[in-house]
């Protein structure tokens, strides 16, 4: 069990609800993932669902904690307004804060992000800020009152994995008491393992499951990957060595010679 913004959870995998081939694929993938937290966008929720069933009705059946996001916002004002709508609509003070500053790589706009985070925290929100792995930006968000940081592993939807493990490792070292969740760029279960081996608290992903040939099966793979990575970190992995070291201690006389000489 772990604590995320006051909620006790078993799963360290958070899953998005966009881009699935159908509502059935989404529901099965979320079920297989074991996640207890799903992200949802205001714009996506207000659109009609597939197969005659509204998206919102499908989401309610999942019985997960909702993490609404401010996807599509490009300045603090828009993000704050969207967050207020989400709080009223979904009855939650959680908000995944996204303020995009570039169309090419969907990188967050740092100045507007910090501004929005500060205002939303003052208004009683629990802010989950989508940010880069920039140490100074993350420090400013913490100074603004963020107890959670969600740095990217790589640009959204790229599937490139962790493009700067050193920066992420530095964040873990510098913010030991902050909840760190990788958000964006994860493409393979092995990427999720790597995240958790760095000591991160969780992984949030969407595209890697939604666009897989078999979303439900991929969700299962990510479920096990996150567990394996976390257990590896908790178990204490051996340090790398520059030279070989025998795993079996050697003695002067082979054991079968010792037996024959008895």
Swiss-Prot record:
Q: Which residues constitute the catalytic centre?
A: 96 (schiff-base intermediate with dxp)
Q: Please name the Gene3D superfamilies in this protein's record.
A: Aldolase class I (3.20.20.70)
Supply the EC number(s): 2.8.1.10
Reaction catalysed by this enzyme: [ThiS sulfur-carrier protein]-C-terminal-Gly-aminoethanethioate + 2-iminoacetate + 1-deoxy-D-xylulose 5-phosphate = [ThiS sulfur-carrier protein]-C-terminal Gly-Gly + 2-[(2R,5Z)-2-carboxy-4-methylthiazol-5(2H)-ylidene]ethyl phosphate + 2 H2O + H(+)
A biological process (GO) of this protein is: thiamine diphosphate biosynthetic process
Q: Give the record's GO CC terms.
A: cytoplasm
Q: Which UniProt keywords apply?
A: Cytoplasm, Schiff base, Thiamine biosynthesis, Transferase
Q: In what pathway does it function?
A: Cofactor biosynthesis; thiamine diphosphate biosynthesis
Q: Which GO terms describe its molecular function?
A: thiazole synthase activity
Q: What class does this enzyme belong to in the EC scheme?
A: transferase
Q: Which cysteines are joined by disulfide bonds?
A: none
Write out the residues that bind 1-deoxy-D-xylulose 5-phosphate. 157, 184-185, 206-207
Q: Which family does it belong to?
A: Belongs to the ThiG family.
Cited function: Catalyzes the rearrangement of 1-deoxy-D-xylulose 5-phosphate (DXP) to produce the thiazole phosphate moiety of thiamine. Sulfur is provided by the thiocarboxylate moiety of the carrier protein ThiS. In vitro, sulfur can be provided by H(2)S.
Subunit structure, as described in the record: Homotetramer. Forms heterodimers with either ThiH or ThiS.
Q: State the name under which the record lists this protein.
A: Thiazole synthase
């Amino acid at each position: 069990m772990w604590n995320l913004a006051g909620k006790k959870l078993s799963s360290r995998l958070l899953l998005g609800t966009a881009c699935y081939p159908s509502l059935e694929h989404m529901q099965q993938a979320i079920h297989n993932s074991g996640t207890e937290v799903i992200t949802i966008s205001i714009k996506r929720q207000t659109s009609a669902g597939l197969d005659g069933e509204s998206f919102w009705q499908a989401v309610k059946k999942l019985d997960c904690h909702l993490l609404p996001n401010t996807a599509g916002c490009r300045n603090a004002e828009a993000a704050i307004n969207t967050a207020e709508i989400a709080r009223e609509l979904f009855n939650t003070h959680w908000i995944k804060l996204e303020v995009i500053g570039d169309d090419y790589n969907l990188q967050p706009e740092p100045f507007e992000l910090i501004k929005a985070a500060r205002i939303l925290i003052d208004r009683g929100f629990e802010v989950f800020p989508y940010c880069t792995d920039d140490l100074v930006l993350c420090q400013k968000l913490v100074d603004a009152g963020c107890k959670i940081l969600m740095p990217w592993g790589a640009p959204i939807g790229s599937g490139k994995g962790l493009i700067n493990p050193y920066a992420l490792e530095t964040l873990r070292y510098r913010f030991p008491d902050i909840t760190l969740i990788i958000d964006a760029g994860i493409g393979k279960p092995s990427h999720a393992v790597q995240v958790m081996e760095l000591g991160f608290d969780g992984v949030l992903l969407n595209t890697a499951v939604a666009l897989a040939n078999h979303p439900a099966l991929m969700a299962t793979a990510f479920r096990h990957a996150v567990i394996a990575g976390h257990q590896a970190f908790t178990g204490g992995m051996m340090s790398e060595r520059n030279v070989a070291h025998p795993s079996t201690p050697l003695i002067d006389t082979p054991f079968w010679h010792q037996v024959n000489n008895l």
